[in-house]
């Protein structure tokens, strides 16, 4: 669990997301409240439930990115799902309980990786021993006394020399034959939507088929070390303990990001099949959000303390179009701002992994130095903003399209520019994008 203060969380989010201070503050406080709740004594701790968040704002302004980065900071099980994928129980499609089942799968994988990292060092030593046993088989004991001891000392010295060479990577390309444990047979079962529970049960019946069997393989030492380290680490783990920790992690720290929640609102009051289905999904979501117990293959999972972050553009609907019970379960509402030209400029250069840095790094692999002048950045931001205004507003995602079109020729002919420097200024931007951005019909298809 993260022990960062809200200010530290916002500072970390600022490295990746431009603007949206209100949304960042809301999620930072929600995450800090997780830690605060853990410090409260029982039985009051059980009564403190997370305050779910509803983010309202157009596409491409950072709603999903804020939730994704937050989960990374919290090191928490996180799942992003589109509300439109789910249907009311009885209709063809996925039911909302599968959200928790998917989340617990993510948590088990995350917990297993964490536990394996803890024993990685010991597992690596054991894997090295197994490789050295193949490279240097133990000599058969011949005689007793001083001569046997001397032979043993020589063998140990040789073994240490080989271990040193193994760790330095000098033996990486040498091939050896090993008995490697076969993974359990995975079964892919195609089933109708809504029958995930049944397929899970069938899959678990066959999950142990083939496990424990060993296969003799010829592999390079570098690959053998990785395979054997994973095998030794897996032996050290207690599967039941991993499952228990994973369930606890979901119950206490899980984050569910419900995207496109505005698409399941009732847009008129005349009813109709579609409206019934949309309202049905909301009613199915309600117990999940307010706290229920879901049966999974890892045991019962309570959703009382899972944090739900919902988001939607709400162009054709309003938050008040959600059923009243669901509205009440999202007490914190945050409106995200549309992006300005200045925001676009900052997105291009100011974040830790900005688009400009990404393209500079990509072209540097072919010895092409890409430089962006300030006026070039400004012009690029202006064009992206103008195209958004004239056509469909897709927010910061427009920058991907614009910069790809801008660098199309340079990327294509990068091999011919090796050792050269390419400067992107406003003149270069206008030459590459000017005609396309001015012609509304053309920009609708190209940008």
Swiss-Prot record:
**A cellular component annotation (GO) from this entry:** HslUV protease complex
Question: The organism sits in which domain of life?
Answer: Bacteria
Give the keywords, sorted: ATP-binding, Chaperone, Cytoplasm, Nucleotide-binding, Stress response
* Record keyword NADP present: no
Where is this chain primarily localised? Answer: cytoplasm
Q: Which family does it belong to?
A: Belongs to the ClpX chaperone family. HslU subfamily.
UniProt cross-references to Gene3D superfamilies, sorted A to Z? 1.10.8.60, P-loop containing nucleotide triphosphate hydrolases
Q: What is this protein for, i.e. what is its function?
A: ATPase subunit of a proteasome-like degradation complex; this subunit has chaperone activity. The binding of ATP and its subsequent hydrolysis by HslU are essential for unfolding of protein substrates subsequently hydrolyzed by HslV. HslU recognizes the N-terminal part of its protein substrates and unfolds these before they are guided to HslV for hydrolysis.
Q: Which PANTHER family match?
A: ATP-DEPENDENT CLP PROTEASE ATP-BINDING SUBUNIT CLPX-LIKE, MITOCHONDRIAL-RELATED, ATP-DEPENDENT PROTEASE ATPASE SUBUNIT HSLU
User: What compartments host this protein?
Assistant: Cytoplasm
Which GO terms fall under molecular function for this chain's record? Answer: ATP binding; ATP hydrolysis activity; peptidase activity; proteasome-activating activity
Keyword Nucleotide-binding annotated: yes
Q: Which InterPro entries match?
A: AAA+_ATPase (IPR003593), ATP-dep_Clp_protease_ClpX (IPR050052), ATPase_AAA_core (IPR003959), Clp_ATPase_C (IPR019489), HslU (IPR004491), P-loop_NTPase (IPR027417)
Tell me which Gene Ontology terms the entry assigns under biological process. protein unfolding; proteolysis involved in protein catabolic process
Quaternary assembly: A double ring-shaped homohexamer of HslV is capped on each side by a ring-shaped HslU homohexamer. The assembly of the HslU/HslV complex is dependent on binding of ATP.
From the Swiss-Prot or TrEMBL record, give the protein name.
ATP-dependent protease ATPase subunit HslU
The disulfide bridges present are none
NCBIfam families given for it?
A: hslU, PRK05201.1
Please list the residues that bind ATP. Answer: 18, 60-65, 259, 325, 397
């Amino acid at each position: 669990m993260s022990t960062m203060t809200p200010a530290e969380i916002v500072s970390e989010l600022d490295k990746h997301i431009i603007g949206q201070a209100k949304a960042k503050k809301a999620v930072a406080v929600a995450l800090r409240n997780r830690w605060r709740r853990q410090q409260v004594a029982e039985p009051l701790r059980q009564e403190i439930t997370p305050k779910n968040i509803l983010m309202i704002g157009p596409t491409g302004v950072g709603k999903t990115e804020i939730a994704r980065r937050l989960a990374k900071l919290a090191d928490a099980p996180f799942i992003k799902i589109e509300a439109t994928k789910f249907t009311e129980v009885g209709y063809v499609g996925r039911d909302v309980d599968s959200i928790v089942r998917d989340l617990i799968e993510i948590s088990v994988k995350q917990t297993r990786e964490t536990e394996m990292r803890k024993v990685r060092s010991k597992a690596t030593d054991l894997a090295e021993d197994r490789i050295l046993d193949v490279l240097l088989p133990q000599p058969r004991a011949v005689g007793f006394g001083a001569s046997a001891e001397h032979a043993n000392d020589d063998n140990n010295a040789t073994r240490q020399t080989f271990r040193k060479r193994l760790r330095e990577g000098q033996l990486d390309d040498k091939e050896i034959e090993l008995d490697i444990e076969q993974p359990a047979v995975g079964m892919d079962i195609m089933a109708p939507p809504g029958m995930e529970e049944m397929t899970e049960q069938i899959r678990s019946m066959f999950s142990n088929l083939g496990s424990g069997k060993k296969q003799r393989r010829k592999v390079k030492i570098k690959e053998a070390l990785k395979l054997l380290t994973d095998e030794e680490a897996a032996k050290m783990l207690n599967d039941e303990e991993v499952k228990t920790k994973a369930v606890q992690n979901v119950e206490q720290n899980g984050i569910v990001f419900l995207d496109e929640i505005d698409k399941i609102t009732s847009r008129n009051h005349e009813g109709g099949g579609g409206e019934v289905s949309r309202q049905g999904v909301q009613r199915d979501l309600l117990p999940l959000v307010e706290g229920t117990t879901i049966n999974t293959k890892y045991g019962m999972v309570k959703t009382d303390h899972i944090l739900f972050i919902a988001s939607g553009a709400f162009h054709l609907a309003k938050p008040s179009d959600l059923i009243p019970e669901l509205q009440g379960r999202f007490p914190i509402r945050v409106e995200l701002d549309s992006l300005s030209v200045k925001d676009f400029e900052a997105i291009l250069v100011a974040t830790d992994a900005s688009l400009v840095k990404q393209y500079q790094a990509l072209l540097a692999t072919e010895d092409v130095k890409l430089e962006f002048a300030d006026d070039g950045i400004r012009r690029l931001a202006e064009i992206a903003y103008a195209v958004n205004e004239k056509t469909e507003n897709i927010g910061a995602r427009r920058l991907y399209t614009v910069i790809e079109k801008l660098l199309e020729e340079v990327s294509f002919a990068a091999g011919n520019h090796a050792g050269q420097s390419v400067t992107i200024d406003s003149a270069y931007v206008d030459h590459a994008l000017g005609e396309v951005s001015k012609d509304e019909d053309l920009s609708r298809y190209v940008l």
